[in-house]
């Protein structure tokens, strides 16, 4: 997997196709995240996000913000993760990416230290998933709400 990702990265580095290069960096970021090399994952996700922001590809940018946030959570950097989630949420809301909004709100509900704000994020996520008919995600968010209510 690593060799494939590195080959794609090298092959697209010198091309004019910024989107493909950004995607190859995101794939590398995902690889490094899976093997818990958070520094390299952050490096590649950040590079992908920078390129996608220039290309005006808001959906991909939101997805990479979420991936960056997850790597930061895994690294114990919850406050920084929340910043990426909030950036992604702003773009998702501006573009009416409702599924992504729900996902980001659920993630914010996991990292937010303030219990009241955590509940707010989770309730908003739950409402969006209910509107979208995403039953499985609703159950998962309901479990998060339960944990928040129980103070965990």
Regions found by a protein language model. Name each.
Residues 15, 28, 35, 55, ...:
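Structural motif corresponding to the intra-repeat A-B loop/turn of tetratricopeptide repeats
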Residues 34-39, 46, 56-86, 90-93:
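Alpha-helical adaptor scaffolds
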């Amino acid at each position: 997997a690593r060799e494939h990702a590195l080959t794609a990265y090298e092959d697209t580095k010198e091309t004019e196709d910024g989107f493909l290069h950004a995607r190859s960096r995101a794939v590398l970021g995902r690889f490094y995240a899976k093997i818990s090399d958070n520094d390299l994952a952050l490096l590649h996700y950040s590079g992908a996000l920078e390129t996608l922001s220039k290309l005006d590809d808001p959906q991909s940018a939101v997805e990479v913000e979420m991936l960056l946030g997850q790597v930061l959570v895994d690294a114990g950097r919850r406050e920084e993760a929340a910043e990426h989630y909030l950036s992604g949420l702003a773009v998702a809301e501006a573009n009416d990416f409702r599924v992504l909004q729900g996902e980001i709100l659920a993630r914010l509900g996991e990292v937010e230290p303030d219990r009241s704000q955590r509940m707010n994020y989770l309730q908003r996520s739950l409402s969006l998933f209910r509107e979208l008919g995403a039953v499985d995600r609703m159950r998962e968010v309901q479990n998060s709400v339960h944990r928040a209510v129980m103070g965990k």
